[in-house]
């Protein structure tokens, strides 16, 4: 478990070198008092593990840029991918001049997974209103990086909202494509609206030959139609099965991972090749935010996908 005495930790992503797991996580000081303030004071922490359980904290990987920059308020969720001997990190940035409303996606690179350099072209992916809704608190965040299955460049899957459908169920998987991880083309969403308001922290993986989409849904982001259809279902991490890593996915039939307090879950293979689920422990639905990252949970024990 990753627990820090002076900081809350929440959303995270993992880079696997084959010998070590590097975890990057959002963190904010508990001295803020109110856990809601953590969102506007987030930096990206870094820790290293050999077994996904015991973590050596390695400091802060990214902080917001100085006042006046496009990412001057907080640095949010992303993902890491290695290409041509260099690690590439896509992450979400917000700025203080608009109180963090406008979310944009940026690129940083590293040779050693410790020291990160922001790309001069940042932000590299911005919302395209042809396909994605601009709302008071804009949904354009949490990019998940993957190589194109056919070898044609790279894809980013993004938490986004469609421009049509019931307002409480417009959440979709946004999509951008790149030939080189620097130049990005925003494309139409990879899923249809209709179930949730937001599909947060998406990830795709090929689990024993089955393409799986994993995302998380907050209690107030479950659409009314789905809530009426599944009144006993709680919110949290959700698993949907697809036809490929780029969809389509059967989100209407998606299943919630039945682990209390778990949120922003990730799928990771351990050294034995077994799929494990990790997530941060929330607890705010019960009145107390926890802010720790769980130990791994074997996916097969959860009966998923």
Model-derived features with residue positions:
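Carbohydrate-active catalytic/glycan-binding domains of CAZyme proteins
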Residues: 1-305
């Amino acid at each position: 478990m990753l627990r820090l005495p002076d900081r809350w930790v929440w959303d995270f992503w993992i880079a696997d070198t084959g010998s070590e797991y590097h975890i990057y996580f959002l963190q904010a000081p508990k001295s803020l008092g109110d856990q809601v303030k953590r969102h506007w004071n987030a930096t990206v922490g870094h820790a290293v593990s050999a077994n996904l359980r015991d973590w050596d904290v390695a400091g802060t990987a990214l902080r917001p840029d100085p006042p006046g920059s496009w990412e001057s308020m907080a640095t949010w969720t992303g993902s890491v991918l290695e290409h041509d001997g260099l690690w590439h990190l896509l992450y979400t940035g917000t700025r203080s001049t608009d109180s963090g409303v406008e979310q944009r996606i940026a690129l940083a690179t590293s040779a050693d997974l410790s020291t990160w350099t922001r790309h001069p072209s940042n932000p590299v992916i911005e919302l395209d209103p042809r396909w994605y809704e601009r709302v008071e608190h804009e949904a354009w965040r949490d990019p998940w990086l993957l190589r194109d299955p056919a070898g044609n460049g790279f894809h980013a899957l993004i938490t986004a909202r469609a421009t049509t459908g019931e307002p409480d169920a417009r959440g979709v998987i946004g999509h951008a494509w790149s030939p080189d991880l620097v130049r990005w083309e925003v494309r139409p969403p990879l899923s249809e609206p209709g179930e949730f308001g937001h599909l947060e922290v998406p990830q795709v993986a090929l689990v024993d030959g089955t393409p799986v989409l994993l995302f998380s849904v907050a209690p107030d982001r479950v659409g009314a139609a789905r809530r009426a259809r599944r009144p006993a279902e709680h919110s949290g991490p959700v698993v949907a099965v697809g036809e490929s890593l780029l969809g389509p996915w059967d989100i209407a039939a998606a299943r919630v991972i039945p682990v209390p307090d778990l949120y922003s879950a990730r799928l990771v293979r351990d050294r034995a090749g077994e799929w494990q689920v990790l997530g941060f422990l929330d607890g705010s639905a019960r009145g107390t935010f926890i802010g720790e990252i769980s130990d791994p949970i074997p996916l097969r024990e959860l009966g998923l996908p």
